[in-house]
């Protein structure tokens, strides 16, 4: 049957191999790997402006000049544009059928839909109605190409995308907002959305520091506030020259009970960070947010952002326990002897060395498995998406694991348990300084989840904790973050580009904490890890 067939495709076999590489490491969430679908920000602007005919002409020009190794892929992109046009034709025919049976305002509405669908997306949009209609069809086709999981496809700076079309007719803020409500409804199909974590951003500054807020920014905020829908996530770029009016327009979101709250991003911080990580100055203003909080360059960046997930809390647990899970009793890591220690006192005295050494070894295995997962998803090419990710110029698929089809490429690692580890290191230091004779007692208390030693639990809970203006532990957290980030960045993805650290936990601090035993910061077995850090 179909399920059996899908279980033995080349994609399924390659993905199975990736998880085989991970072995038992993923059984209790030491780390996790996945084949990344979605999590990109296509640049829809050229297709909105020129239509599929303009994009097809560019493809044909580049196809004629390229080598034989890329001609087939250029052809695939052209066929994918045909699919978008077929979809538009179907809707146009449906609108025409509805028009024939309607009267009054309904007839006028269907007539407008029919005429619009016969124009876009083949040709460029000339007003906001046409631009939104074209965008919806483009987005629908892109999501269908990655069915069933187009997670975290994100719009980018929607106010900059749509403002030129609003301005062409000087459409009022109120009318523009009413059209954007239809756009937001599109993202929420029936009782769910196309996919979770799709993001839309407004605001921000240019590469020269000029504020780029425009009338469409406010129209989009009005639409979001009135609709209060869960998808797409609303994000806002801020900077030192953000106008007072934008802050005032945002206030209603934060002070209305039950209303969605936008995520805020600081251009003045992110611009230098992105530039330091290799983003060209000319591309900085086009950074947007994919998914929850991942900054990527619109139309140029395959960040592969959720390719791997690392659980520092679990690694610390195994370092202290001699490699035996205190959750299940399963042997998952190195013994004390393999870590170079004769007893538990030596383990605690050398906990930082042991921890970072084990992080490096687990990260090495994690990235090998993650790269294998990327190779699996690379078998499922995405020619339509690639027309908006640099493929028109390169003739290379966005997911290609042998040749880089986007200007920027990397792989992500979401890191969990930073504060748990930092607090634990300080607690261990405190115990060794004040009562070193209790080293074995601490390890036993962790093994039994403090059930027989509530006094030890109370002692650990009273040690200094991150985030309480305690310089010692805050410095420790900084050191843990820097060292772990350096370890992760030393690993290379399928194209030889670095893995990037992301100290964030969309909600997985709950799941990953469930697989971590008691830790020296006083956290009990299966309790969640720190949110974000």
Q: Each PLM stretch: what is its role?
A:
Residues 68-98, 102-123, 128-129:
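Mature N-terminal, pre-catalytic/accessory segment of carbohydrate-active enzymes
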């Amino acid at each position: 049957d179909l399920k059996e067939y899908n279980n033995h495709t080349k994609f399924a076999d390659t993905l199975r191999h990736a998880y085989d590489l991970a072995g038992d490491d993923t059984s209790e969430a030491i780390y996790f790997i996945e084949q990344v679908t979605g999590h990109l920000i296509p640049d829809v602007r050229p297709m909105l402006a020129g239509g599929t005919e303009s994009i097809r002409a560019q493809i044909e020009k580049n196809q004629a000049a390229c080598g034989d190794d890329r001609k087939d892929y250029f052809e695939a992109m052209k066929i994918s544009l045909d699919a978008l046009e077929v979809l538009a034709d179907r809707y146009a025919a449906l609108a025409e059928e509805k028009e024939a049976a309607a009267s009054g305002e309904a007839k006028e509405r269907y007539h407008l839909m029919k005429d619009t669908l016969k124009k876009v997306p083949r040709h460029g949009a000339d007003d906001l109605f046409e631009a939104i209609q074209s965008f919806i069809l483009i987005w629908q086709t892109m999501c269908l190409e990655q069915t069933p999981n187009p997670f975290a496809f994100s719009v980018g700076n929607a106010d900059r995308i749509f403002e030129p079309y609003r301005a062409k007719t000087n459409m009022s803020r109120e009318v523009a907002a009413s059209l954007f409500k239809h756009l937001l409804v599109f993202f929420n199909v029936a009782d769910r959305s196309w996919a979770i974590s799709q993001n839309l951003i407004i605001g921000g500054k240019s590469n020269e520091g000029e504020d780029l807020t425009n009338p469409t920014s406010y129209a989009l905020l009005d639409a979001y506030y009135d609709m209060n829908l869960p998808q797409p996530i609303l994000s806002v770029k801020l900077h030192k020259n953000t106008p007072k009016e934008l802050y005032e327009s945002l206030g209603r979101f934060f002070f209305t009970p039950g209303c969605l709250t936008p995520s805020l991003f600081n251009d003045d911080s992110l611009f230098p960070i992105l530039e330091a990580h290799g983003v060209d100055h000319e591309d900085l203003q086009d950074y947007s947010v994919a998914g929850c909080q991942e900054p990527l360059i619109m139309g140029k960046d395959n960040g592969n952002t959720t390719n791997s997930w690392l659980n520092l809390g679990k690694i610390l647990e195994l370092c202290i326990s001699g490699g035996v899970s205190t959750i299940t009793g399963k042997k998952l890591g190195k013994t004390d002897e393999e870590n170079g220690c004769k007893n538990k006192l030596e383990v605690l005295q050398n906990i930082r060395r042991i921890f970072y050494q084990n992080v490096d070894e687990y990260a090495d295995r994690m990235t090998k498995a993650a790269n294998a997962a990327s190779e699996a998803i690379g078998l499922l090419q995405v020619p339509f998406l690639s027309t908006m990710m640099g493929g028109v110029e390169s003739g290379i698929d966005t997911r290609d694991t042998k040749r880089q089809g986007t200007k920027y490429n990397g792989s992500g690692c979401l890191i969990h348990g930073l504060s748990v580890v930092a607090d634990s290191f300080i607690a261990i230091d405190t115990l060794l300084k004040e009562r070193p004779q209790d080293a074995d007692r601490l390890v036993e208390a962790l093994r039994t989840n403090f059930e027989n030693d509530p006094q030890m639990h109370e002692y650990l809970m009273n040690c200094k904790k991150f985030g309480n203006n305690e310089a010692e532990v805050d410095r420790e957290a900084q050191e843990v973050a820097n060292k772990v980030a350096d370890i992760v960045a030393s690993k290379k993805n399928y194209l030889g580009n670095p893995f990037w650290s992301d100290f964030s936990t969309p909600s997985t601090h709950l799941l990953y904490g469930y697989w971590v035993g008691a830790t020296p910061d006083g956290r009990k077995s299966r309790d969640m890890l720190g949110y974000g850090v």
